[in-house]
Swiss-Prot record:
The gene is pdhS. Interacts with DivK. Residues 500-533 are annotated as: Disordered. One of its GO terms (molecular function) is histidine phosphotransfer kinase activity. The lineage of its organism: Bacteria, Pseudomonadati, Pseudomonadota, Alphaproteobacteria, Hyphomicrobiales. Its main location: cytoplasm. Functions as a polar differentiation marker. Essential protein that, by localizing in the old pole of dividing cells, controls cell division and maturation, probably through control of DivK phosphorylation status and cellular distribution, which in turn regulates CtrA, a transcriptional regulator of the minB operon. The asymmetrical localization of this protein is probably required for cells to enter a new division cycle. One of its GO terms (biological process) is regulation of DNA-templated transcription. The keyword Kinase applies. GO terms for cellular component: cytoplasm; plasma membrane. Gene3D superfamilies: 1.10.287.130, Histidine kinase-like ATPase, C-terminal domain, PAS domain. InterPro entries: HATPase_C_sf, His_kinase_dom, HisK_dim/P_dom, HisK_dim/P_sf, PAS, PAS-like_dom_sf, PAS_fold, PdhS_histid_kinase. It comes from Brucella abortus (strain 2308). This is Cell-division control histidine kinase PdhS.
Amino acid sequence: MSGSYPFIDIAALDSVREGFARGDAQLVLAHDLSTVLWVNGPGAKLFGYNRVEDLIEGQLDLPVATRRQIAAFSSENTSAPSAVAVRLGGGLRSELTHLHVSNIKLPDGVAALLVATQMPDNSAEAAISGLGDDSTHIALVDAVGKVVAASPRFALLDISASTLEDLIVEAGDATDRIVKRRIRTGSHSVPGAIARLTDTPALHLLCIVGDAPAQFQTAAEAVPLPDNAEAVLEEILPEQGDAPAQQAQKTHAEQPRPKTFAFDHDAPPARFIWKVGPDGTFSEISPNLAAVVGPNSADIVGRRFSDVANVFGFDTDGSIAALLLERDTWSGKRLLWPVEGTRLRVPVELAALPVYSRDREFLGFRGFGIVRPAEAEADPEEIGLALAGGIPQNRKPRKEPAETARMVGEDDVLALSEEVANDDQPAAVLPKPPLDITPTPGRRDSDKVISLLNSCAQEKVAADQAKFLKEKERATRPEGGLTKTERNAFREIAERLRKQGLANTRAESETPVSETSSIEPVEPTPPVKTRSEPIQPDETALLANLPVPVIIHSGDAIHYVNQALLDITGYESLDDIRSAGGVDVLFNSESDDGETRQSMLLRHADGSEEPVDAHLNAIAWRGGRALMLSLMPVTAADLPAPAELPAANDEEKQALEAHVEELKTILDTATDGVVLIDPEGRIRSMNHSASALFGYERDEAEGKFFSMLFAIESQRAAMDYLHGLSGNGVLSVLNDGREVIGREAKGGFIPLFMTIGKLPHTRGFCAVLRDITQWKRTEEELTNARKEAERASNQKTEFLARISHEIRTPLNAIIGFSELMADEKFGPIGNDRYRDYLRDINRSGNHVLALVNDLLDISKIEAGALDMQFEAVSLNDAIGEAIALMQPQANRERVIIRSSFQSNLPDIVADSRSIKQVALNLLSNAVRFTAPGGQVIVSTSYELNGDVVMRVRDTGIGMSKSEVEQALKPFRQINALERRKAESAKDWRNEGTGLGLPLTKAMVEANRAQFAIDSNPGQGTVVEIVFPPTRVLAD
């Protein structure tokens, strides 16, 4: 097991060992989220690898969305695992996997990320799966030295039970839970290590590094080679004379790349990626273009498109330059690109997509192009020679058969693109598919733009792959299909053809091409049949005897058909098919009614048609390349059963047609957009509202993929929603809709709320799209209003705090000097009126200071910035202290204060200072608003439901409901001029600041209690404060 860290060192970490013992899938990544530092067997299997060695110290190409989710959770500076749900896989087979991401420290202190998830198989064998080879042996050992699970060759080491027991004792005594030393195996010792994974029950991981005994190695290595091994080796490796194979491989590996560029006229079409900035400057271009037109001709990074067009002489009408200024999606633009070192120029087709940032800032264009070297034409200006710095030497590149070049890139009637061809086709012969799902280290994000521009093609590939998997899983076929023996024979033949094609391609690429300054004419020799001939007569005979119809063709040229195809189509021979029109006459991809079928239609000689399933493979054929198309007739059991409709007479038919027209009219009248989708995800039809919403005509949108209606960032969510409904899963029951971003025909974006439902008979879907632009605008306005209110509150709090500081200093001076003068410490004042003035000054200063304090407190409470020290508070003691402070004022006002405290009242969780302030405010108001001779009663109680209640009741003048509401608002005082008591009672409600009750209510709610007031004019007021059971410290 390779890696920068020993496998057992990371397996013994506290955050890893228990999950390893359970059989969880675990992966340790560097913070670049690409480099794999460590992985166990289930973790390697989760990401598609069978062996741990295949992934450790490698590059893991996670999807962009998965990287973004993991990076968001890994940015938190905590070691606690965070749960994240990601999709692993691709297309319709992607599965939602719940991962746990946590930050860990490696043995050398380096920070890393641990990604783990539970696996269904938690056996001991699964925990050590993917580990162990001829020189590395792994085992799980329990507390008594019993081997619970082990790698296949572990038993050959012959480790005694006493040795295992000693290792277990040593691992239990080690502070780091790991012991590394030489371990006795049979008659010799080898390096090894043991780590204690769990304690209850005890489980240990044992790693041995060393070869098995020689007698076992001999038996294991003496495995006979296959009969065709020599032939396979001769096909794969080029002949090197008498030199050893190792020296030949070394020479080939060290062979330098050619310094000069040679144009290959017969090369297949090649795709390349390009990107320009907002000013039209090329910022990126893939090397595929340089491989066709030369490195100097493709060296355009850092140059503006207009400058390149002027130098190379294309886009003379300025159409592409104008499209770059419009910032809209475009495609199908053709230009002629000069080829370095030649007098030729090749056609290039370009397409581009505008790129915007999250803030809708235009970042430029990302696009792809297709260069077609087989269609090269003469360049009258000979720009390619200038790019090479002169006329190059006459070199003739090795040519492939013309049929192969013509085969690639053609839009034949089979409608099968390179994306659905065999995945094993050589890249040097057939063009790379637009969506490469093979993990590639260091892959740039711009390489994925093709999948965005070709979303339709991508979904077609996914649909074809799903159909192919369904065909593979079918155990038996009805009459007319393949038996199990026939299917196995057919697959074996296809595999042999494919492997021979790969061997020929590899041999041709590894054969060195020697350059000669002059070529001497030689006598022509007859062609000699070499051993690399792809198809032998016996294999052709096997194809001829298969019951499966087979066609070998290149583009429109048919090379071979077997007897099964002639029987099913009714033709007498291959010449009859060629004379009738070739491939065009055999297939029809659309039915007469224009509906696109999931299967193809094979046309017979008499004009009748039959649905078939087609599978395409790239093979080697008579020294060149060709495509092998195998056909499987679709029986009635495979076709979807049409919905049975009862027979209807003319009147019922007319009624049904009228009803359908009414429903169409209703749909067109609805303000929401309605789109009908077929099972393949294509648009069947849409109503007038949807057509107006997206700016597409009905005929223009029909037949195109549903994903075209959405912005790039919403296409995945929309298609996942659609696929989730097709699977009869949770989404089909809990259908709550999705918020997506729609894309207009002119490139604009619309926020939409989409709801999709299933159609029962056609297996299609119905999508209802509602424009929520106004909702989003209202939501944004409310958010802005909330932010503005919070900002105003913060400004008010800051202003009050600042003004309070400025007012306190002079107020303290006024109050202090007035008290000093009233005491006459430096001499008599001499006049009683001056003494009264000083007392008024002191009283007024204290009043202003109390007002400032109340303003600051209520602003802090509203802003949530009041410092609260929650602790156990005795409510009886707090109220008693407040009564003691208010008793002198009550005596002056001739008001009686009575108390009724419940004994054994439990403490409450509250802020002691604010509780005392609440009691003082309530008692002060009760005394002030009670006439002489009245009473104020303060009581506490412990209710049966666990509440602690404090009540303050007075016999004062009381208030009406409207006056209570006004009194609870800041800076509002009750106008008592209209209602005064006729007798000697004095109405004190005109005094004060109007902050008493609002401040009291705010303090009560800040202590998580409930404030209630009940008052009636002339009957007094009752204030009740209830502390819920969650704030009561009951025994």
